[in-house]
């Protein structure tokens, strides 16, 4: 069960970070200097 819990937490953190990065990278008002990192 411990390994399963670690796997679940890893997947959740991965998706949350991916969603956050995507949201911030698509918001030019918050990151005006990241337009060249498309």
From Swiss-Prot:
It is found in: Plastid, Chloroplast thylakoid membrane. Keywords: Chloroplast, Membrane, Photosynthesis, Photosystem II, Plastid, Reaction center, Thylakoid, Transmembrane, Transmembrane helix. GO terms for biological process: photosynthesis. It comes from the Eukaryota. InterPro entries: PSII_PsbI, PSII_PsbI_sf. Its main location: plastid. The chain crosses the membrane at residues 4-24. PANTHER family: PHOTOSYSTEM II REACTION CENTER PROTEIN I (PTHR35772:SF1). One of the components of the core complex of photosystem II (PSII), required for its stability and/or assembly. PSII is a light-driven water:plastoquinone oxidoreductase that uses light energy to abstract electrons from H(2)O, generating O(2) and a proton gradient subsequently used for ATP formation. It consists of a core antenna complex that captures photons, and an electron transfer chain that converts photonic excitation into a charge separation. Belongs to the PsbI family. PSII is composed of 1 copy each of membrane proteins PsbA, PsbB, PsbC, PsbD, PsbE, PsbF, PsbH, PsbI, PsbJ, PsbK, PsbL, PsbM, PsbT, PsbX, PsbY, PsbZ, Psb30/Ycf12, at least 3 peripheral proteins of the oxygen-evolving complex and a large number of cofactors. It forms dimeric complexes. This is Photosystem II reaction center protein I.
């Amino acid at each position: 069960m411990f390994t399963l819990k670690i796997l679940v937490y890893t997947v959740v953190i991965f998706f949350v970070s991916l969603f956050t990065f995507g949201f911030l990278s698509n918001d030019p008002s918050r990151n005006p200097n990241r337009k060249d990192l498309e």
